[in-house]
């Protein structure tokens, strides 16, 4: 909505200057193949459906009551899955909310926080919103993080691993080096896509008192529609996040979301099966795209980042859209000739490849 300057007089000055995050579009197109927001192509575990039905049918009267503000059952399920204590788990209304609390709790410092110049575009939004100083660290020519670049004065560090939108993962060894180089600052590893082949830093939580790991149920557990994210850290860091949460919204997760997420964590076999299917489809898709001339960055996510030396990325995106296929293009320096493509089912990926062949050939 366009608001005139005259009507903006009611706005807080800070809000007038905000540059909000722009989410991937959710278009209403017939026979749409949606490969632009990294949603899982497979449904959640059948146990999730059963859990939601139980809340709706057997516990409907309880909907008049607020949900558990601590989401205790969910924290217990996450702690069990991650081999941590409940005191080392924080939950929120999607990992974006968890990240917002992280910025508020740890990053308002006298020195700038560090993050890659090409990364999740919510980081600069939160930085502006909370008045956090920032310094963007350029990825190298291969779009990789250079660990040594993060050995400088800072107010904290946040790294998406695997990185978005590049899909490239940082090794656990390199993450540990960043932690060791910054013992007096909080280092946040944002692991929205970690379950598709990268190494999680959750195994380092008990070793480093400056580490926060942020994860989500939206991608690998197919629960993007219910908004459940969480952080893993030592108890003293979790306490700061709880203080921020309870100063903002004491009941961030509803009964349906709690029940669904708990059920998801209780069905590990289904979770692993779906992740493997996405990984296998990703590798097959990469091979198919490389065959028709695309350059594809090495991916450990449920999406790939591709460019074609003979075709303009935005034109390819427009051509795909005309055929009912939506992918993500970022009109930003260094990556404006790339497309981010969510990995679909094998059938969906084949439709994508067949459509691209019409333009490439």
Curated annotation (Swiss-Prot):
Required cofactor(s): pyridoxal 5'-phosphate
GO terms for biological process, alphabetical: L-histidine biosynthetic process
A GO MF label: histidinol-phosphate transaminase activity
EC number: 2.6.1.9
Residues where N6-(pyridoxal phosphate)lysine is found: 219
Transmembrane intervals: none
A matching Pfam family: Aminotran_1_2
Domain of life of the source: Bacteria
HAMAP family: HisC_aminotrans_2
Record's protein name: Histidinol-phosphate aminotransferase
Origin species: Acinetobacter baylyi (strain ATCC 33305 / BD413 / ADP1)
Gene (name only): hisC
């Amino acid at each position: 909505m366009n608001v005139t300057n005259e009507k903006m007089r009611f706005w807080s000055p800070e809000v007038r200057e905000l540059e909000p995050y722009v989410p991937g579009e959710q278009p209403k197109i017939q026979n749409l193949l949606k490969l632009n927001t990294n949603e899982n192509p497979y449904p959640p575990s059948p146990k999730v459906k059963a859990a939601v039905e139980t809340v709706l049918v057997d516990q409907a009267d309880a909907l008049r009551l607020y949900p558990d503000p601590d989401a205790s059952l969910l924290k217990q399920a996450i702690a069990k899955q991650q081999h941590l204590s409940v005191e080392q788990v924080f939950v929120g209304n999607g990992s974006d909310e968890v990240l917002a609390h992280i910025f508020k709790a740890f990053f308002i410092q006298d020195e700038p926080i560090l993050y890659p110049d090409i990364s999740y575009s919510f980081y600069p939004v939160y930085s502006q919103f909370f008045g956090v100083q920032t310094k963007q660290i350029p990825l190298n020519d291969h779009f990789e993080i250079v660990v040594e670049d993060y050995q400088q004065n800072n107010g904290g560090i946040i790294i998406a691993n695997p990185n978005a939108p590049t899909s490239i993962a940082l090794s656990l060894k390199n993450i540990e080096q960043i932690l060791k180089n910054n013992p007096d600052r909080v280092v946040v590893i944002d692991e929205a896509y970690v379950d598709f082949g990268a190494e999680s830093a959750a195994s380092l939580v008990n070793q480093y008192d400056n580490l926060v790991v942020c994860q989500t149920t939206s991608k690998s557990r197919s629960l993007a529609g219910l908004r459940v994210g969480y952080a893993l850290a030592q108890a003293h860091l979790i306490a700061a996040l709880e203080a921020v949460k309870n100063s903002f919204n004491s009941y961030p997760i509803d009964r349906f979301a709690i029940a669904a997420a708990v059920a998801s964590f209780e069905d590990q076999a289904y979770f692993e099966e779906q992740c493997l299917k996405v990984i296998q489809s990703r590798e097959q898709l990469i091979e198919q795209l490389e065959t028709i001339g695309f350059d594809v960055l090495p991916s450990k996510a449920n999406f790939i980042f591709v460019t074609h030396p003979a075709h303009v990325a935005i034109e390819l995106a427009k051509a795909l859209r005309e055929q009912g296929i939506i992918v993500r293009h970022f009109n930003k320096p260094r990556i404006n000739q790339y497309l981010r493509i969510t990995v679909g089912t094998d059938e969906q990926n084949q439709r994508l490849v067949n459509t691209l062949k019409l333009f490439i050939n």
